[in-house]
Structure formats: C-alpha cells, structure tokens
C-alpha cells in the first residue's frame, strides 16, 4: 500500500477544512476530535483508506453520514477526479458541508441532505456508485445494509472502524458480500457481482 502525501495546495485546503470544522463544531457537534489531533485522526486515517482502496480514476464515491466531511471532503480534496456525494440527514450538518465545499471550491462534491436509506432507493443513486466510504456512522452490519443499495455490483464499502478484523468476522457469513480487514482500522466490504 503506497502512502499518499498531500501537495502543498491540498494541505492548505485540508487545514482550512479542519479550521472550519473546529469553528462550526462549537455549534453543531460535528466531531469529538480536538483540533490538535484532527490532522492525525481525520486526514491521516482517510489517506490510509485512500491508499488501501486504490480508487480508480473517475470513480463515483458516496460518504454515508458525512457529518463534518470526514472522510468525504478529504477524499474530494485528494482526488479531484472523483465525484463525491456527501450524504448527511441532519440539515444543519448538511449546511456545513455545503459551506465547506463552496469555501474550498470543491466542484466535485454534491451534498445530499437525505437519509442513506432514501438514497439507495433513488434511481439516480441505486447501484450507481463505485465506492462508499464512512466513519463512525453505524455498526458495520447496519452500514453494510445502507451501503449495498448504493454500490454497483463489484463496488466496495471502505469504512474507518475501530476493530477491522472483528467487524469483518461479524460480516463473514453475509450473502452477497465479501468482507476483510484491509488495514488497521479499515474495513472493506465488496458487493459481489450477480
């Protein structure tokens, strides 16, 4: 797994995102991670996910329960070739995501102020995405239920979780998916082709 390092311009955008996240967090409770640990917890962990996932050029990505934009905004900054949809049911948090996408001039982001369950049934999103990413949104079995309708056959869910081997083991017998611990703290679940 090759390390991914932000350019100076990307680092600037990511730092602005973290600064805004810190300011807005006082009103919206977007993250429990303090600003002095945000780079490590938000950016570096997402960079690890991107390195493990080896996302193909031009892929369609969805971040379920985006909240403060982790990992979705980091993915959009690091990979401007991707189209990234940030799903956030809380309209106030979705407002933050719209603000940050505009502030950072991220034209590859779309914000959907909806529930993931609704998006999976929407013909514009049902089985239209190559990759679903998420962090601390739901227990892995529920996250898989939310992600599978959004993924194309062969698409993959990449989730930042605490114990990836245990999460993968809990999903081992689930029909239609293949789960594995891709790296420490990273769960991968592939939607099998029909």
Language-model region placement:
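Short, structured coil/loop segments at alpha-helix boundaries
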Residues: 7-11, 72, 89-90, 122-123
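Residue-level preference for alpha-helix termini and adjacent loops
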Residues: 29-32, 69, 118
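S-adenosylmethionine
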Residues: 79-85, 89-194
């Amino acid at each position: 797994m090759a390390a991914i390092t932000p350019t100076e311009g990307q680092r600037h955008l990511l730092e602005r995102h973290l600064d805004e996240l810190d300011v807005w967090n006082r009103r919206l409770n977007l993250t429990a991670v303090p600003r002095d640990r945000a780079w490590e917890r938000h950016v570096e962990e997402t960079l690890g996910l991107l390195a493990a996932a080896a996302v193909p050029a031009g892929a369609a990505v969805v971040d379920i329960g985006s909240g403060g934009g982790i990992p979705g905004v980091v993915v959009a900054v690091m990979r401007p070739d991707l189209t990234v949809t940030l799903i956030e049911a809380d309209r106030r948090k979705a407002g933050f995501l719209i603000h940050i996408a505009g502030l950072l001039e991220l034209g590859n982001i779309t914000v959907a102020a909806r529930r993931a369950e609704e998006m999976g049934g929407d013909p514009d999103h049902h089985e239209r995405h190559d990759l679903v990413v998420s962090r601390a949104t739901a227990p892995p079995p529920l996250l898989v239920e939310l992600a599978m309708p959004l993924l194309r056959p062969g698409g993959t869910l990449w989730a930042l979780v605490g114990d990836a081997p245990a999460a993968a083991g809990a999903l081992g017998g689930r029909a239609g998916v293949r789960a594995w611990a891709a790296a420490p703290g990273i769960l991968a679940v592939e939607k099998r082709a029909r």
